[in-house]
Curated annotation (Swiss-Prot):
Known partners and oligomeric status: F-type ATPases have 2 components, CF(1) - the catalytic core - and CF(0) - the membrane proton channel. CF(1) has five subunits: alpha(3), beta(3), gamma(1), delta(1), epsilon(1). CF(0) has three main subunits: a, b and c.
Native source species: Cupriavidus taiwanensis (strain DSM 17343 / BCRC 17206 / CCUG 44338 / CIP 107171 / LMG 19424 / R1)
A Gene Ontology biological process term: proton motive force-driven plasma membrane ATP synthesis
SUPFAM superfamilies given in the database record: ATP synthase (F1-ATPase), gamma subunit
Organism superkingdom: Bacteria
Compartment(s): Cell inner membrane
GO cellular component terms, A-Z: plasma membrane; proton-transporting ATP synthase complex
Entry similarity comment: Belongs to the ATPase gamma chain family.
Annotated keywords: ATP synthesis, Cell inner membrane, Cell membrane, CF(1), Hydrogen ion transport, Ion transport, Membrane, Transport
Membrane topology classification: Peripheral membrane protein
Reported function: Produces ATP from ADP in the presence of a proton gradient across the membrane. The gamma chain is believed to be important in regulating ATPase activity and the flow of protons through the CF(0) complex.
Main location: membrane
PANTHER family linked: ATP SYNTHASE GAMMA CHAIN, ATP SYNTHASE SUBUNIT GAMMA, MITOCHONDRIAL
Stated name of the protein: ATP synthase gamma chain
Length: 291
């Protein structure tokens, strides 16, 4: 059995680790609230752009945007959203497993894939598996800006417009709640027809008629680009909210485990110390009896 000094050293080490994980848990909780607020704030913009584009598309059905053209899928673009840092449980592992399954499925059908990495972990993963990475953006920080994302996203959007890829997929982690995050692989392009359909309530709300400059088609084309960019930004915002939630939960679990380990070590320490005292008393009694 280890000596009391060695056990005290272990207890001190675990206590120091618990202080670190507790601090990281508190920081993640603070960042999580901000990330969730940012995620909620991003949703109305994308929805407003979608409604305006849907109204214009309904009013001008003769306009056919390249983003809505369906082709036989021979080449695919994949935008992979991950975190820059670790210590967030199985968040990245789960989404990258979904990406791996999708890549295997596509490659099994003879489909070529080119990837865009958003986040360091995704960039490292795509490099390890030898994927063709055509653009990337890393080190977004705690506050993602659309300006940083546009360059990497535009590579895939232009590739689809020019016919270099026939579909674009978006992989990210969807925020469900603090305890649950779900890996997603969704088709980004071509836009499904239901994306630009309107409910009766939306039709009444957007029943206005304006004069557009330079013309309605140009406005629709620009709006659809903004809408797709907003969808990617929303995915990044959801991924960041998921990251901070997963990190908070992971650090809380680490802190709780450290507390349990400290309790177990303290019990071992007490037993060891008690055994040492009992042994000393026995030796004293034996010595006294011998005299």
């Amino acid at each position: 059995m280890a000596g009391t000094k060695e056990i005290r050293t272990k207890i001190k080490s675990v206590q120091n680790t618990r202080k670190i994980t507790k601090a990281m848990e508190m920081v993640a909780a603070s960042k999580m609230r901000k990330a969730q607020e940012r995620m909620r704030n991003a949703r109305p913009y994308a929805e407003k752009v979608r409604n305006i584009a849907a109204h214009l598309a309904t009013a001008n059905p003769e306009f056919k945007h390249p983003f809505m053209q369906e082709r036989e899928v021979k080449r695919v673009g994949m935008i992979v959203v991950t975190t820059d840092k670790g210590l967030c449980g199985g968040l990245n592992t789960n989404v990258l497993r979904s990406v791996t399954n999708e890549l295997k499925s596509l490659q099994g059908r003879g489909v070529d894939v080119q990837a865009t990495a958003i986040g360091t972990k995704g960039m490292q993963f795509l490099g390890r598996i030898g994927a063709k990475v055509v653009s990337h953006v890393v080190h977004l920080g705690d506050t993602p800006h659309l300006e940083k994302l546009i360059g990497a996203i535009k590579v895939q959007l232009d590739a689809f417009t020019n016919g270099e890829v026939d579909a674009v997929y978006l992989a990210y982690t969807k925020f469900i709640n603090t305890m649950k995050q779900e890996p997603m692989v969704e088709q980004l392009l071509p836009l499904a027809a239901d994306k630009l359909s309107q409910t009766e309530e939306e039709k009444r709300a957007y029943s206005w008629d304006y004069i557009y400059e330079p013309d309605a088609q140009t406005v629709v084309e620009e709006l659809l680009v903004r809408y797709v960019e907003a969808l990617v930004y929303q995915a990044v915002a959801e991924n960041m909210a998921s990251e901070q939630s997963a990190r908070m939960v992971a650090m809380k679990a680490a802190s709780d485990n450290a507390k349990n380990v400290i309790g177990e070590l303290q019990l071992v320490y007490n037993k060891t110390r008690q055994a040492a005292i009992t042994k000393e008393l026995s030796e004293i009694v034996s010595g006294a009896a011998a005299v």
